[in-house]
């Protein structure tokens, strides 16, 4: 009976820590945020509204302090937040008017060649990159699969106003201009909307063909690799090919979405940009992401990649604008690299719990047999 009392006391305090203290500490260190939202227009409306609310609170606090300087600064920040809220609203209202179904890929290619090739390449259609290093701050991306991994409305917003689409207006402004300029709109709304639809059609059409070619080559290479192995059964070969295919696809998406800034040294991947250039450009060196899945967890990364400002307010990391499929691929890649033994670890944990349960039964039985002789 005494042992049961001790057992229940241990269970009580363990449960208190596990379901009480630990979740509370987690909520303090990692405050809850709104869920992942791939409707970027709605997400921006919520974000800018939140920014205005923060600045209004700061203005109230400044008025309470009585400091004229603090009041002036707070009022200026509030007016800026309100102007950005209105400008962001107008941006997404413009994007909402675009009929992407009427885009012409060939005209989009012509527009790209006339406006974008100074910085960007599209190797899938034979357009080489003009800038191949990070001397301007970061290596400009090749846009061969931009139409596959980015949300089409986000891409259009990025073309029209990069700073607002990327949520980096706190970092880049007129005094510190962003590397990518806004697309030169004509002022004719109908023509501008058609041009944007054409550009997106070009990106999506190019990405579709590029992905097909990439998949076919990858599959052929894997089949050739395992065809030489006579020890494996056909079923085992098929399973391994599928596993490596998924990993390579996920890595490919990561490289295009994140690989210009971040290393993953556990997988031998090094960013295409020079870290010192990135530090000067962003204000800090982007972290290696090898173990980020273990330190932050998949749920945190889902929210952070979708909208970095939700987790680290004021961070220089831009919102990437990945669609849901591409974001899942990025997280799966990081999980495979940083937590490759997750399934085995979880399964081993169950076995250990069973082992200790059986051991406890034998320990109690042994204790009773020993003490029964003494009494």
Identify the role of each PLM range.
Residues 29, 103, 109-139, 161-174, ...:
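Periplasmic/extracellular electron-transfer cofactor-ligation site
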Residues 2-10, 17-18, 23-36, 74, ...:
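Short sequence/structural segments immediately N-terminal
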Residues 106-117, 244, 248-259, 269, ...:
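Sequence context surrounding c-type heme c attachment/ligation sites in exported
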Residues 2-26, 153-154, 181-214, 299-311, ...:
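C-terminal capping alpha-helices of c-type cytochrome domains
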Residues 31-63, 69-112, 127, 208-254, ...:
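Electrostatic cytochrome c docking/interface patches
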Residues 106-110, 114-117, 141, 153, ...:
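Solvent-exposed, polar/charged alpha-helical surfaces in well-ordered, non-transmembrane soluble domains
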């Amino acid at each position: 009976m005494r042992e049961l009392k001790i057992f229940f006391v241990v269970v009580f305090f363990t449960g208190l820590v596990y379901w009480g203290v630990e979740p509370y500490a987690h909520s303090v260190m990692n405050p809850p945020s709104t869920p992942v939202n791939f409707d970027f227009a709605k997400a921006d409306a919520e974000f800018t509204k939140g920014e205005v609310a923060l600045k209004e609170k700061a203005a109230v606090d400044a008025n309470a302090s009585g400091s004229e300087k603090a009041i002036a600064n707070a009022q200026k920040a509030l007016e800026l937040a309100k102007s950005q809220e209105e400008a962001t609203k107008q941006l997404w209202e413009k994007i909402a008017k675009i009929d992407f179904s009427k885009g012409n890929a060939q005209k989009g290619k012509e527009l790209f060649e006339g406006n974008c090739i100074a910085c960007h390449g599209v190797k899938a259609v034979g357009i080489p990159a003009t800038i191949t290093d990070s001397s301007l701050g970061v290596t400009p991306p090749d846009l061969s699969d931009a139409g596959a991994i980015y949300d089409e409305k986000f891409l259009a917003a990025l073309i029209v106003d990069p700073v607002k689409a990327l949520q980096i207006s706190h970092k880049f402004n007129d005094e510190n201009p962003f590397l990518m300029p806004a697309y030169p709109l004509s002022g004719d709304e109908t023509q501008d909307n058609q041009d944007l639809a054409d550009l997106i059609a070009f990106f999506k059409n190019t990405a579709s063909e590029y992905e097909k070619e990439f998949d076919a080559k990858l599959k052929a290479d894997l089949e050739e690799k395992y065809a030489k192995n006579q020890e494996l059964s056909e079923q085992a070969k098929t399973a391994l090919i599928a596993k490596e295919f998924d990993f390579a696809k996920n890595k490919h998406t990561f490289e295009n979405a994140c690989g210009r800034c971040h290393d993953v040294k556990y997988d031998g991947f090094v960013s295409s940009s020079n870290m010192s250039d990135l530090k000067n450009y962003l204000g800090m060196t982007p972290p290696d992401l090898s173990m980020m899945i273990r330190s932050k967890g998949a749920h945190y990364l889902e929210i952070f990649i979708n909208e970095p400002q939700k987790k680290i307010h004021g961070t220089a990391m831009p919102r990437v604008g990945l669609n849901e499929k591409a974001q899942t691929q990025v997280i799966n890649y990081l999980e495979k690299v940083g937590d490759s033994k997750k399934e085995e670890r979880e399964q081993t944990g169950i076995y250990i719990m069973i082992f200790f349960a059986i051991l406890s039964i034998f320990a109690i039985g042994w204790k009773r047999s020993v003490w029964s002789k003494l009494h």
